[in-house]
């Protein structure tokens, strides 16, 4: 699969993102305005949460699919025999976030949502 890298400073950036999404379902963008330092800080916060926090108290809500997904309940992808052993946390607006990651997560969510609107409008 080939995923194009789209420069958001390009005159036709919106068209290129759309084409990439149609072709592969993904778009990789560069020259967005979200600082890498903010993403790195977010990784540090979430790493601390998974290593030192209590993720089990944020177990996934079955209806919204928001919250903590444990590797103990890993899914098996269609056509595969082995489970996909990973842990992660889904967040949706209005969902619960651990206090230690809330501030940066919400700020990053807002920045990414704004970026998406700018690119797709």
Q: Predicted segments — roles?
A:
Residues 1-121:
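Peripheral, non-catalytic segments flanking oxidoreductase cores
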């Amino acid at each position: 699969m080939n995923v194009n890298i789209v420069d958001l400073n390009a005159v036709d950036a919106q068209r290129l993102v759309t084409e990439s999404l149609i072709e592969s379902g993904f778009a990789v963008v560069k020259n967005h305005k979200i600082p890498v330092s903010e993403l790195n800080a977010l990784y540090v916060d979430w790493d601390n949460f998974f290593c030192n926090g209590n993720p089990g108290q944020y177990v996934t809500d079955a209806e919204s699919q928001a919250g903590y997904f444990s590797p103990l309940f890993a899914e098996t992808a269609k056509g595969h025999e082995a489970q996909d052993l990973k842990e992660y946390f889904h967040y949706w607006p209005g969902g619960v976030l651990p206090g230690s990651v809330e501030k940066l997560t919400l700020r990053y969510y807002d920045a990414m949502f704004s970026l998406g609107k700018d690119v797709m409008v």
